[in-house]
Amino acid sequence: MSWQDYVDKQLMASRCVTKAAIAGHDGNVWAKSEGFEISKDEVAKIVAGFENESLLTSGGVTIAGTRYIYLSGTDHIIRAKLGKVGVHCMKTQQAVVISLYEEPIQPQQAASVVEKLGEYLITCGY
């Protein structure tokens, strides 16, 4: 499967996320859903935020030009929200899966889909 297939067939087809991307730790976007304009700098800040949570607690999580309020996270998960739109990101060994979801999708639904793909990528060495 190509990276675009993972975005289209695993994330978007689930209907549990409304926009999604997979990128490298260097910020380069490998694949993204149609109309999802996330920048290399935004991805790089998300990746840095996994290591240094204070970057996100003070500056929020910016995706496609919109700043979301950081809610919680770990060394491999980031959760954020702004209004009716939520963010769920997962870091793997070489990649980061970034997703947006909108109500009525529940945070747990998006988390399940994103983390299932993330765990699979980890088992594949990514």
Swiss-Prot record:
Bridged cysteine pairs (disulfide): none
A GO term for molecular function: actin monomer binding
Predominant place of localization: cytoplasm
PROSITE patterns given in the database record: PROFILIN
GO BP: any one term: regulation of cellular component organization
Xref: SUPFAM superfamilies: Profilin (actin-binding protein)
Subunit structure: Occurs in many kinds of cells as a complex with monomeric actin in a 1:1 ratio.
Protein name: Profilin
Organism of origin: Bombyx mori (Silk moth)
